[in-house]
Amino acid sequence: MAEPGGRGDYHKDGRPPSLSRSPLFTTLGTSPACGLEIPPTSGARPDGSCSLPAHVYHLQSRQWKGMGRGHRQRWRLQGWGDGDTGCVVQAPSLFPAEIRERTTVKMATLPLDLCAGACWEM
């Protein structure tokens, strides 16, 4: 189990480096239910469900901007039921409006408190 806050290197679990570098993994960590462990502050229950009022947003695609250490990973979030590349549960009130409107956002720049209720297939 990772320390609270979800920081760490998950190569030991056999995950690809691209997952551990994800800004979402920086926030989430990893959990037994679906390979993700959720920090206590996220509102997640022990069974992996989320105790916050939440919608599910699927991470439909990712793009890279820039090169080297300064790059930022960008995710396109789709609404409930879209896509199959993974999903994140987040309290709607914590989501900026531009995310709810399905635009591409730079996740690395958003101090989101994420909690997961679904598994990842990256």
Curated annotation (Swiss-Prot):
Basic and acidic residues bias locations: 1-15
Disordered: annotated segments: 1-26
Name of the protein this chain belongs to: Putative uncharacterized protein FBXL19-AS1 homolog
UniProt organism field: Macaca fascicularis (Crab-eating macaque)
